[in-house]
Swiss-Prot record:
Major localization listed first in the record, in broad terms: membrane
Span of the annotated motif Selectivity filter: 174-179
Segments on the Periplasmic face: 31-38, 150-160, 180-184
Lineage of origin: Bacteria, Pseudomonadati, Pseudomonadota, Alphaproteobacteria, Hyphomicrobiales
Intramembrane residue spans: 161-179
GO CC terms: plasma membrane
Protein name: Cyclic nucleotide-gated potassium channel RHE_CH03180
Positions bound to 3',5'-cyclic AMP: 297-298, 307-308, 348
């Protein structure tokens, strides 16, 4: 079997291999395993390692494609193979299996999450730094107050600010006491205030990151939809302001090959623009194929007529759908867009465009 197909091991399969491997690593640390059981586990680890070797080979053989987009996958594939191999050669038999824990990274090789996380952190760095500064101030203030209040009561635990700082860290980051508990009333009041401050600070961090993720995902969706809309010939002559209105109204949709998009006789509530792929229109005479740049289902928006034909996906097709409600909003806010769609639809049907 060629090594190249192994470069296409899916993310779920990578996760499955990694999960099995890590469970085996955990099992090998238990006491009382027989020699036969240990051998079976070792062979299972070797089989997963060989699968990763084939995946790495496939990745290296397909380097003709863009290098930057696959660099993360290549690095993870290399680590998944080289780290266990180096451990087998240079580490004692007791601990060498533990190095297979590097397979924790395998499910992330095709993930875009860390790129998204890096963008969010970069965008929100000023706010995150501000909250971190507040955390540091509260941390030192809590340690100082704990030292002053508890140093005579518990000198072994609060005898210095560095000692009290451990209590402050634990109290700020958890709800409840850690291994050090204030004994005085003032110390307990301080602990309650520190715990509430910690809840507020971590809520600020979480809120900033959640808002940043939402804004970044929305921005990426807007850029992707803009590119899809700009690829439709019907909209290529429109200005930026009009395109923005369309991007807000159109909704992307992926339809698998063979799926029915709309059926003859149905009451339609949307029209479709083909961005990529082909669809088959079942006309009375013979089927007609439409490709990228074409649209269909427009009469449902213009005249409200039922669907005149059944349309199905000849291949996997990327569509942009415009609902009747959004079409009415576009007609009010940007009449030129609605008029362009209306004229083009009537011309396709052989009728004169309405002036």
């Amino acid at each position: 079997m060629s090594a190249v197909p192994f470069s296409k091991i899916s993310t779920p399969l990578n996760a499955l291999f990694a999960t099995i491997g890590l469970l085996v690593v955990a099992a090998l640390t238990t006491q009382g395993l027989t020699g036969q059981e240990r051998l079976v586990f070792e062979l299972l680890l070797a089989a997963i390692w060989l699968a990763y070797v084939l995946q790495l080979s496939g990745t290296l053989l397909s380097r003709r494609r863009r290098l930057s987009g696959e660099m993360t996958a290549l690095v993870i594939d290399l680590l998944a193979v080289l780290v266990p191999a180096a451990a087998f050669l240079f580490v004692g038999s007791r601990d060498r299996d533990l190095y297979c824990a590097i397979w924790l990274l395998k499910p992330l090789r095709d993930s875009t999450f860390f790129r998204l996380l890096a963008k969010v952190v970069a965008n929100e760095s000023r706010n995150l730094l501000g909250v971190t500064s507040v955390f540091g101030i509260v941390l030192f203030g809590a340690a100082l107050a704990g030292y002053i209040i508890e140093r005579d009561v518990q000198p072994d635990k609060f005898g210095s600010i560095p000692q009290a700082m451990w209590w402050a860290v634990v109290t700020l980051s958890t709800t409840g006491y850690g291994d050090e508990i204030p004994q005085s009333l003032a110390g307990r009041v301080l602990a309650g205030l520190v715990m509430m401050s910690g809840i507020g600070i971590f809520a600020l961090w979480a809120g900033i990151l959640a808002t940043g993720f939402y804004e970044e995902v929305r921005r990426q969706d807007f850029v992707r939809n803009w590119q899809l809309v700009a690829a439709v010939p019907l909209f290529q002559k429109l200005g930026s302001a009009a395109l923005i209105e369309i991007v807000r109204a159109l909704r992307p949709r992926i339809v698998p090959a063979g799926a029915v998009i709309c059926r003859k006789g149905e009451v339609g509530d949307q029209m479709f623009f083909i961005v990529e792929g082909r669809v088959t229109v079942a006309t009375p005479d013979h089927p007609v194929e439409l490709g990228a740049g074409n649209f269909f289902g427009e009469m449902a928006l213009i005249s409200g007529d039922p669907r005149s034909a059944t349309v199905s996906a000849a291949t996997e097709v990327s569509l942009l759908s415009l609902y009747a409600v959004d079409f009415q909003i576009l007609s009010s806010s940007s009449p030129e867009i609605a008029e362009t769609i209306r004229k083009t639809a009537l011309e396709r049907r052989g009728g004169p465009p309405k002036e």
